[in-house]
Amino acid sequence: MRFSVGLGKEGAEERLARRGVSRRDFLKFCTAIAVTMGMGPAFAPEVARALTGSRRPSVVYLHNAECTGCSESVLRAFQPYLDELILDTISLDYHETIMAAAGDAAEAALHQAVANPDGFICIVEGAIPTADNGIYGKVANHTMLSICSDIVPKAKAVIAYGTCATFGGVQAAKPNPTGAKGLNDALKHLGVNAINLAGCPPNPYNLVGTLVYYLKNNAAPEMDEFNRPLMFFGQSVHDNCPRLKHFDAGEFAPSFESEEARKGWCLYELGCKGPSTMNNCPKIKFNQTNWPVEAGHPCIGCSEPDFWDEKSPFYES
């Protein structure tokens, strides 16, 4: 199923306008993506060109063991809404959550997209159960392990979206009876080298920024030791936290209900994992509105490997 008709170079503004997206809103969105990529507002025109170019890549979005929160994060993005822009920039040919097709028709759409002679980008959400040959997770009577083993190596670019897909997430928490693994770990024998966009949930602007980078450069961005793009994961949450001045001053909230917490004092002594967590949450926030620490909740380190085990307990008293 194709959800988009494409923007193309000709009439891009007119197509956006028909969907209720003004030129101002579009450029505001492009500026936000440019800032997320660490390029600054001056890079916004390049983002706009990438998003309205004639190349409209086919995208196959696979679901494994997950809660669909990563998809929800993308679908609830605004300025503009996803269906007003992103689905006109890519050809989303398979996504189990939002596609109209079901059953055999959905399976046919998947295989048709994979057979696209121009290739496709594969986005993977969710951990892959690997124990007992992957029998603990199936779609259409095929194990998630076998589906990913078949589809993912054929893609020209692969993005693991969310901490479950990147590092296994909660499914991989001890004792991990299903043998859940992140994509690169589960398929390392096939040479899969996915771009890891960690987070629980991940920020949709990081996904758009990655797609923009790929559309412009036909290559993956520079990544860290965990295959996370440095333009999003190059600094710790602590480095850009609005409460950093209180940390430096030794001002720590003693409890969540304290006056100090209401004044915005540092949450480190209440369990905040910001100093050991690489992510750009403070820079872009969610929907450019808010993020956990600013809302009064400690960072739980959700973009780090094995955070359910390694970062717990999430709170200190």
From Swiss-Prot:
Pfam families for the chain: NiFe_hyd_SSU_C, Oxidored_q6
Reaction equation(s) it catalyzes: 2 Fe(III)-[cytochrome c3] + H2 = 2 Fe(II)-[cytochrome c3] + 2 H(+)
GO molecular function, one term: electron transfer activity
Biological process according to GO: anaerobic respiration
InterPro entries reported in the protein's UniProt record: Cytochrome-c3_hydrogenase_C, NADH_UbQ_OxRdtase-like_20kDa, NiFe-Hase_small_C_sf, NiFe_Hase_small_N_sf, NiFe_hydrogenase_ssu, TAT_signal, TAT_signal_bac_arc
Enzyme class: oxidoreductase
Binding site for [3Fe-4S] cluster: 281, 299, 302
Keywords: 3Fe-4S, 4Fe-4S, Iron, Iron-sulfur, Metal-binding, Oxidoreductase, Periplasm, Signal
Signal peptide residue numbers: 1-49
Cofactor comment: Binds 1 [3Fe-4S] cluster.
Post-translational modification, as annotated: Predicted to be exported by the Tat system. The position of the signal peptide cleavage has not been experimentally proven.
Cofactor(s) the record lists: [3Fe-4S] cluster; [4Fe-4S] cluster
E.C. numbers: 1.12.2.1
GO cellular component, one term: membrane
Cellular localization per UniProt: Periplasm
Subunit structure: Heterodimer of a large and a small subunit.
Family membership: Belongs to the [NiFe]/[NiFeSe] hydrogenase small subunit family.
Name used for this protein in its record: Periplasmic [NiFe] hydrogenase small subunit 1
Recorded name of the encoding gene: hynB1
